[in-house]
Structures are given as C-alpha cells and as structure tokens.
UniProtKB/Swiss-Prot annotation:
Family matches, as SUPFAM superfamilies: VC0467-like
Transmembrane segments: none
Top-rank lineage group of the source organism: Bacteria
Name of the protein: UPF0301 protein mlr7511
Cellular component terms (Gene Ontology): cytosol
Family recorded in the similarity comment: Belongs to the UPF0301 (AlgH) family.
InterPro entries, per database record: AlgH-like (IPR003774)
Gene source species: Mesorhizobium japonicum (strain LMG 29417 / CECT 9101 / MAFF 303099) (Mesorhizobium loti (strain MAFF 303099))
Amino acid sequence: MDLLRHKKTAAGRGFLDDQFLIAMPGMKDDRFTRSVIYICAHSDEGAMGLIINQTQQMLFPDLLVQLGIMNEQEAIRLPAQARDFVVRNGGPVDRSRGFVLHSGDYRVESSLTVSDDICLTATVDILRAISSGRGPRHALMALGYSGWGAGQLETEIAENGWLTCPASPELLFDADIERKYDRILASIGIDLAHLSLAAGHA
C-alpha cells in the first residue's frame, strides 16, 4: 500500500498515528458500528488503520493452511496459543491481505514502526513465527484494512463521526474483544449512555 511505503521512507509521524479512532453512536456506515480502529499511518495523503474489535469466522490454523504455510496435519498440532489466535476483520479494503500489529520485541526488515511500542508487519514471516512460538510477545492479526483518502478522515472527525484518543498497548492487545469499545471509552472517562452525537474530541 502506497501510504505504508510512504510512512517507511518519510520522517516524522502524522498527528493521528498511534491513535484509537472510536465510532460515534449513530455511525451511518454499518461496517463501522461500535468499531475501534487503530491508526497505523496518517499523512496529508490519507490514513490507514485496522479495526481491532471485529472478528473473522476464519480460524488461524485454517488461514495458515490456505496460505500454504503448513498442511492440515501440521495445523492440528499447533500449540494452543497459536490455535486460538483470533483473526480479525481489519476493514473493508483488500480483505484478502493480512496485517499483524505487534509489540516491538519482534521486528523484521519489512516491519513498519508505528510507535515506540507498536509495529505493523504484513508478510508471511511473522505468521510462521507466531505459529512456531517465535513471534512477538503481543500481537493481533487482521484481514483487510480501513482506508481514507486525503482529508477524508479529518472531515469525518470534524463532523463528529469519530472520537480520537491516544492508543495504549494494554488496550490494543487486550484479549477481551467484545468489551474493547466500552473499555476504551471508559479509559477516557466517557460513559456510552451519556455520549451524544455532538461530542467532540476526547
């Protein structure tokens, strides 16, 4: 993706990099209802992020078989941690492509540093590492991503489509996917019951 390639070569960060994007009540696009998106790259050319609280039906072992990383017999023998690794729905764009957000203890040449603590890798090498227990300490994987053109996300935020707040590794990698939306709102002092459509930035 051009935006990620640009981020690897450009100095500095966009002001929405390493932020949570939280869908406001009344989100008009059903694909993003109650969604939390982690922004991986942002610049004047656009933005790219991954929904972190929607899951796919596909299981991680099945994905490894589909990608030719291992056969079905090898997939059956995966350690429990790899078998239970949740595949998430990262967004409506390029849904056949996989992305792994992970802690900075694992880096390869293709890894994109989003923040001091968080990297993004989109190659099969990290899937092999995770399946063999040699992967990062914390990771989440998603198929597809969420993307915006130049100025599009800024407009949606200004029109109160989204709240933004700084991301934290603890909430990003927290395994409680169902409660992630409410927990992130609570972390910035917002009760969903009192959140109005006119709310601004957190």
